[in-house]
Amino acid sequence: MSILLGGKNGLEWYMGEPGKSAPTIDHYGKDGIRKALIDNAKQVEATHAAPDNLMEVVIKAGPKSTYQNLVAILDEMKITNVQIYAIVPITQMELDELKKNGYN
């Protein structure tokens, strides 16, 4: 799962490779990204044979996201018990997607 952090407290997420599916526009909190993290983790667990196959989350912050946005998403990693995550640079294609949706 990749999570894109944008300006105006906006975020988008997608599963799999970039460009293969349209990102889902979401928000912070229990009915937003938290629900998506929990639901996607269950789906990954159900579709992979071994119980130790955990969902991996890639966090990508756009230039207009804030430190508070990053802290909030890291809090969500802890709350939802996501054990494997990384903060990596955002790609130009992902920046374009954020811009298209008004978050960059």
Name each model-derived stretch.
Residues 1-104:
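Long, low-hydrophobicity, acidic/polar, solvent-exposed interaction domains
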